[in-house]
Amino acid sequence: MRLRLSARIAAALAAITAVGLAACSTAAPSAPSASAADTTIPLLTVGLNNTEDGAPQTLDVTKAIGADYITVLGLETLMRFNAQGKVEPDLATSVTEPNPVTYVYHLRHGVRFWDGDPLTATDVAFSLNYDRANGSQVAFAYPSVKSITASGPYTVTVTLTHPDASWPYTPAEINSQIFEKKFYEAHKSTYGQAGTLVMGTGPWKIDSFDPTTGAELSANPHWWGGKVPIQRIKMTSFASATSEALAFRAGEIDLAPDVYTPLSFASTSGAKLLATPSCDIDIFIMHVTTAPWNDVHVRRAVAYALDRSAIMTAHGGYATPLYTLIPPQLMQNIASKSQIGSLLSSLPLYQYNLAKAKQELAESAYPHGFSASILEINDPTSLNEDQVIVAELQKIGIRLQIKAVTAADWTAVESGPASQRVSSETSASCFNPDPSAYYDLLGSANTAVGSWNVADYAPPAVDTLMADGLATSNPAQRFSTYSKLLGNLQTNIPDVGLYLSDATVALSTKFSAPGYSYWTSPFSSTGQPDFYLDLRPAK
């Protein structure tokens, strides 16, 4: 169905309040939710679909960010997100801000690693510095950090190079998991690998890991948060969504936390999916420093030619159209719904319009079309969506060839030298509810090897706006800056927003998941174990 512009804006605004996004808080309960702790689940079997991100070869998230589905259960963070997206203490009990560039985290006493050693500030500082080191796949989360030091046995001081309104979220993200320094130093060359594993403080101890078959975990009897409800977790890797769905139907797995093709998975598995709106995006990225993508009229033609409804159908439903790189709901903390609506009304949103697409292409250096290649991960969902994109663009004379590669090869290219990155349709996750959540896709800093500015879009004006957006916590000033940034992005359109995907999981009817939300979902990139802690046997 084709929607008028005003209807699309209304749909975008309706999504603003769907994901519970909220400002930071430093007061919190003493422990993560463990409402299922009065009941015991002997074994939970979990499926992992490796077709989208590829099977992680290590549990070291600096080398394999996709390992977070496993490590989130064992490696904790200083802070955490609650179900409403507010930041609360976790391994830290509180945080103080003596000045705009200094954050002092006061650690929880009595926390021990699985080997019995106490958690200290030295472990925390070492972990965070390791995560932010050059070449780390999660280093993008630390652009404003000057230093992280153990300023006392139980205090960690983070000093920023400049004020950063997004920093308070970072210690709650999967990009900031804490592990034991002593264990790492004893196993530097093999840390995270199958024979070595990792050493954490979390509710489940990782007992075994195999990149091909999966992982096994057991309840940590000494967890500081109390009794752990699930005694054992067995994670099994699957080579396809179909094989995972069939295993669910056969009762071989209880939980599929990573349902990428919701409609087909539900049909094959027989599962009634749990779904909640998210701020995870799917976008078509154009590498703006190579022809023909360096022609803005080509990029605008592509934006007009893509039929989001058809692409969402290929995805498998459970999605909402997206027209900007920054999802509108991420600005809820800095602007009112009416302000966001007025901003969207002022921007070119590139609603599906083949006539305008052809007009833009006629104004380009390629009025009769062109041939080009795009890079894609070789999994059914992505390829189905790409086939729709190919068919849509062919209508205006753009002939695309899909080059399908493994997830590892895709990552090597798209986070490799910026000049060699390739246009691609891909998905991305928001690690926090700040409008800067997708900065890793923009700016000169993220053209470095290991970073994710696939479009290689880094004009000085964008760098300046990105910096200005973080330099103050004043909502009005931030909204003004992000309005200008969105204006730049919508005018130059390096990335075409396609849709926001719901966070969908399949859960056996043997269990219930009260309070299911994006911020505590096992599908989420925020890195919380709460979904597992809150699981209950069905009544």
Where are these regions (language model features)?
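Periplasmic-binding protein-like
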Residues: T170, T289, W293-I334, N384-E385, ...
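Structural transition elements
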Residues: A319-E360, T381-N384
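Ligand-site clamp/hinge motif
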Residues: N220-A266, R399
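Extracytoplasmic/peripheral linker and loop segments enriched in polar/acidic and small residues
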Residues: T96, Y350, Q401-D409, Y439-T509, ...
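Long beta-strand-rich cores associated with HINT superfamily self-processing modules
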Residues: V505-K539
